[in-house]
Amino acid sequence: MAVAALEQEILILRKRRQLYSLIGLLLVVAVLVSGFSKSNEMNSGGFLQGLSKFFDYPGEIVAEAWQAGPAFFGLILTFVPAMLETLNIAAVATLLGGAMAVVLAMASTRNVDSWGPLIPVVRRIMDITRAFPELIIALFLIFVLGSSPVPAMIAVAVHTAGALGKLFSEVNENIDRKPIEGLSACGASWLQRIRYAVMPQVAPNYLSYFLLRLEINVRASAILGFVGAGGIGQELRRTIGWGQGAGDETAAIFVLLFCTIMMIDQVSSYLRGKLVGSGRAH
């Protein structure tokens, strides 16, 4: 009897859970439909009208690239300098942001004996740097510094410092404290404990997150070109703005971006796998 009653109770709970899930799903669908209808009304029905032409522009780009013939590959080469500029922005920003992230992570983690009153202050600083997207920071800096790669580099570096700082601090919280306590008992300073007890433990994970962030920053640097921050994004904005007649150049930029990001992703994934594997081995 007790088993039958328990099975009946489980069945009731399961049906109740399914009912709640269905109600939640219906509410989400209702909100999405309502929001879409309102947005479409504000846009004078432009979304549905434009949906029928969704593939028109990509079709024009492909057609113009096909008409270019072998010269299309020459077009790809003409945009390599702009792509290198984007890679430089991403690399420098990742290096600067990564260096700042290490400092922020070490100053915001109790597990590495950081100064107590400083920890919440540094954590709030990291929250602030993560709160603003790179695009918003870049727009502000372009207004102050003018259109150049420098605002993009600073914007990506600031956001990287906050994002990596958070990840690095979580890595710090999971380290073994025995080496730190041993060096502390020997009279080692805080910097010596960080260098000889903390960094050997966290370095593989730090580098893995660093490489992952480099992938993200390459994409971010390309997007920032749309707001005048230089690089391949600025060239893409120019070719798209010209419309018909520049479709082959637009296609060349897309191909170059795709190949570059794919190559970076593959190399980064391979290196991160090696780093994480070596970290576990130790």
Regions found by a protein language model. Name each.
Residues 1-95, 107, 111, 276-282:
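N-terminal, non-cleaved signal-anchor transmembrane helix
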Residues 126-160:
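Generic hydrophobic transmembrane alpha-helix motif, especially the helices
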Residues 103-138, 167-170:
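Cytoplasmic-entry segments and transmembrane alpha-helices of multi-pass inner-membrane transporters
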Residues 251-282:
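C-terminal transmembrane helix and the adjacent membrane-cytosol boundary/short C-terminal tail
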Residues 34-41, 130, 138-146, 240, ...:
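A structural signal for multi-pass alpha-helical bundles of membrane permease subunits
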Residues 102-107, 167-174, 178, 217, ...:
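Membrane-spanning helices that line or support transport/gating and their immediate boundary helices
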Residues 147-198, 204-213, 266:
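Membrane-cytosol interface at the C-terminal ends of specific transmembrane alpha-helices
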Residues 94-102, 106, 135, 152, ...:
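Hydrophobic positions within alpha-helical transmembrane segments of bacterial inner-membrane proteins
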